[in-house]
Amino acid sequence: MQTSLLKPKIIAVESLGENHAKVVMEPFERGYGHTLGNALRRVLLSSMVGYAPTEVTIAGVVHEYSTLDGVQEDVVNLLLNLKGVVFKLHNRDEVTVTLRKEGEGVVTAGDIELAHDCEVINPDHVIAHLSKGGKLDVQIKVEKGRGYVPGNVRRYGEDTAKIIGRIVLDASFSPVRRVSYAVESARVEQRTDLDKLVMNIETTGVITPEEAIRQSARILVDQLSVFAALEGTETAAEAPSRAPQIDPILLRPVDDLELTVRSANCLKAENIYYIGDLIQRTENELLKTPNLGRKSLNEIKEVLASRGLTLGMKLENWPPAGLDK
């Protein structure tokens, strides 16, 4: 009887557009499609290294709830637009860039003054609209990081210096926008109970979907190599206990789910501000929310399912220390 496990012999990459690809791998032993697909998806969404704006200083602005004369957007929307700029740094971990523009017109990411080792992937991204006499002067700090780091976590980190006008941003470093996977049937000779793993990956353009798969696989291999090197349980028994790690996805605000305005407002009315708050609610609890009907509930369930989450989940140590409410 053959005891060795099958390894994929076919790996195909199909481009579905700019920074969007479908990766097909087969054959796998039955069950391994879901085992590896889910592991890769979670690593791709939470653990990839990328770059993001982390701090912003705007001339004439003290806090994010301000407005600027001659600028169509208020500061909150201006910050959201700045977070949409995709940066890529070469051989450095952080940089501060400048955005200056005067006069009527559209301000785009291409107007940012860049250092020689800093690149903007989406220069056509719109940041603001200036009217006649309008002026914008912004300092943007861009850093290298991993996953998603809320601004309140960074704000209470090691750097406690208070600088008037400095606005700390929630930083989504991940170069991966969306990931989904499906497991289909595969056949090898007379065996028809095998798996074919199909992964659909969209990135920001900082890395290609193929490179994203490679990096996520390396992360998994590196983590699992610890188990392969086990020689006994004595060391593990002496290791200090750690509090359970919280998935960075759960620290994201519910606004990142891109729900309809009606659904988002209903959740906020119930003090549900983070995805971690939402997944702990049951369907019955949400249906008791004023103005939230079955249609909105189905929308919430579908959006959560696309990220591998469901309602009614249990979380330990929630909310984490330092999380704003």
Curated annotation (Swiss-Prot):
It catalyses: RNA(n) + a ribonucleoside 5'-triphosphate = RNA(n+1) + diphosphate. It is an enzyme of class 2 (transferase). SUPFAM superfamilies: C-terminal domain of RNA polymerase alpha subunit (SSF47789), Insert subdomain of RNA polymerase alpha subunit (SSF56553), RBP11-like subunits of RNA polymerase (SSF55257). Residues 246-325 are annotated as: Alpha C-terminal domain (alpha-CTD). CDD domains: RNAP_alpha_NTD. One of its GO terms (biological process) is DNA-templated transcription. Disulfide bonds: none annotated. It comes from the Bacteria. Residues 1-231 are annotated as: Alpha N-terminal domain (alpha-NTD). GO terms for cellular component: cytoplasm; DNA-directed RNA polymerase complex. Its EC number is 2.7.7.6. GO terms for molecular function: DNA binding; DNA-directed RNA polymerase activity; protein dimerization activity. Keywords: DNA-directed RNA polymerase, Nucleotidyltransferase, Transcription, Transferase. NCBIfam families: PRK05182.1-2, PRK05182.2-5, rpoA. The N-terminal domain is essential for RNAP assembly and basal transcription, whereas the C-terminal domain is involved in interaction with transcriptional regulators and with upstream promoter elements. Belongs to the RNA polymerase alpha chain family. Homodimer. The RNAP catalytic core consists of 2 alpha, 1 beta, 1 beta' and 1 omega subunit. When a sigma factor is associated with the core the holoenzyme is formed, which can initiate transcription. DNA-dependent RNA polymerase catalyzes the transcription of DNA into RNA using the four ribonucleoside triphosphates as substrates. HAMAP family: RNApol_bact_RpoA (MF_00059). This is DNA-directed RNA polymerase subunit alpha. It comes from Burkholderia multivorans (strain ATCC 17616 / 249).
